[in-house]
Design a protein with these regions (language model features):
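A charged, well-structured terminal subsegment
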Residues: 111-125
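Cofactor-cradling patches in redox/metallo enzymes
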Residues: 14-24, 29-100, 109, 113
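Long amphipathic N-terminal alpha/beta scaffold segment
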Residues: 1-13
Length: 125
C-alpha cells in the first residue's frame, strides 16, 4: 500500500513506484495524495497491507512521516506492517530516525527494498 503524506499533493514519484511494484508482482493499493495518518491506518487495515510506502516531495510535509508511524503503533499495526519511505527530502538516516524499516531513493530501488521488507513481514494469525 502506498500514498503521499498529508499536505503533499505530488504524485508522480508515488505513481512510478506503484507501477514498478505492480509490474514486479506486488499487489498495490494506492491511497492517493494528501493522505492523513488516520486514512493510512484505515487503508492498511482494509487492504491487509504488508508494507506501507510513504511518499513526500515537500520538506514541509516531512513531519507527517513519523505521525503515520506513530498512528500505526497506536492502532496495533506497527508489528504487522513494514514502513518504507521515499521522496526528495528524505534519506536512509531519516528513515532510521523515525523508525521506518525501509527507504528507497528511486522507483527501481523501491522494488528491491520492498522485496527485502517482505522477508521481514510477520503476520499474526
Amino acid at each position: 500500500m502506498l500514498g503521499t503524506v498529508e499536505g503533499d499533493l505530488h504524485d508522480i514519484g508515488k505513481n512510478l513506484v506503484g507501477m514498478m511494484l505492480g509490474s514486479n508482482g506486488f499487489n498495490v493499493v494506492d491511497a492517493g495524495v494528501d493522505v492523513t495518518a488516520a486514512s493510512f491506518v484505515s487503508a492498511a487495515k482494509e487492504s491487509n497491507a504488508d508494507i506501507i510506502a510513504l511518499s513526500g516531495l515537500l520538506t514541509t510535509t516531512m513531519i507527517y512521516f513519523p505521525v503515520v508511524i506513530e498512528a500505526l503503533g497506536k492502532a496495533g499495526l506497527k508489528d504487522k506492517v513494514k514502513v518504507m519511505i521515499g521522496g526528495a527530502p528524505v534519506s536512509r538516516a531519516y528513515a532510521d530516525e523515525i523508525g521506518a524499516e525501509g527507504f528507497a531513493e528511486d522507483c527501481a530501488s523501491a522494488v528491491d527494498e520492498a522485496t527485502r521488507l517482505m522477508t521481514l513481514v510477520t503476520k499474526s494469525i
